[in-house]
UniProtKB/Swiss-Prot annotation:
Belongs to the eIF-5A family. Keywords: Hypusine, Initiation factor, Protein biosynthesis. GO terms for molecular function: ribosome binding; RNA binding; translation elongation factor activity; translation initiation factor activity. It comes from the Eukaryota. Lys-52 undergoes hypusination, a unique post-translational modification that consists in the addition of a butylamino group from spermidine to lysine side chain, leading to the formation of the unusual amino acid hypusine. eIF-5As are the only known proteins to undergo this modification, which is essential for their function. Pfam families: eIF-5a, IF5A-like_N. One of its GO terms (biological process) is positive regulation of translational elongation. Residues 1-12 have a biased composition (Basic and acidic residues). The modification Hypusine is found at K52. Translation factor that promotes translation elongation and termination, particularly upon ribosome stalling at specific amino acid sequence contexts. Binds between the exit (E) and peptidyl (P) site of the ribosome and promotes rescue of stalled ribosome: specifically required for efficient translation of polyproline-containing peptides as well as other motifs that stall the ribosome. Acts as a ribosome quality control (RQC) cofactor by joining the RQC complex to facilitate peptidyl transfer during CAT tailing step. This is Eukaryotic translation initiation factor 5A-1. The keyword S-adenosyl-L-methionine does not apply. It comes from Solanum lycopersicum. Residues 1-23 are annotated as: Disordered.
């Protein structure tokens, strides 16, 4: 090996799987699940007893974590379901561009410029108003299955 230092830009997933398997019977309310290829937060779980033919079934009612749409799925409790890797990261807001993208400061001092303003009206108003007032804002970004979206805001005081 040489004494050269090797620097590389680390990507969040680095080729890792976007989901992991978990037995349907062990997924609880408040957990996450993939339904119709969408990452969802479970809001209701009900289990039916085993019938004459087959397994106990789990009925999941879940909300898509990015669109807010309600999705349902029924899975035998002994089968595996895909569970998304969901991450929340806080970034400091630096700028809002004319075309609706935000410029965020990462932990290592780089900028992240590939996120749009939130689609939620109240969150959008909080971000725009806070930025216009010159407040120091920290935005929470949720990421799962290759998608990212601004999901929260914190005011850390005036600039």
């Amino acid at each position: 090996m040489s004494d050269e230092e090797h620097h590389f830009e680390s990507k969040a997933d680095a080729g890792a799987s976007k989901t992991y398997p978990q037995q349907a019977g062990t997924i609880r309310k408040g957990g996450h699940i993939v339904i119709k290829n969408r990452p969802c937060k479970v809001v209701e779980v009900s289990t039916s007893k085993t019938g004459k033919h087959g397994h106990a079934k789990c009925h999941f009612v879940a909300i898509d974590i990015f669109t807010g749409k309600k999705l349902e799925d029924i899975v035998p409790s002994s089968h595996n379901c895909d569970v998304p890797h969901v991450n929340r990261t806080d970034y400091q807001l630096i700028d809002i561009s004319e075309d609706g993208f935000v410029s965020l400061l990462t932990e290592n001092g780089n900028t992240k410029d590939d996120l749009r303003l939130p689609t939620d009206d109240t969150l959008l108003a909080q971000v725009k108003d806070g930025f216009a007032e010159g407040k120091d804002l920290v935005l929470s970004v949720m990421s799962a299955m290759g998608e990212e979206q601004i999901c929260g805001i914190k005011d850390i005081g005036p600039k």
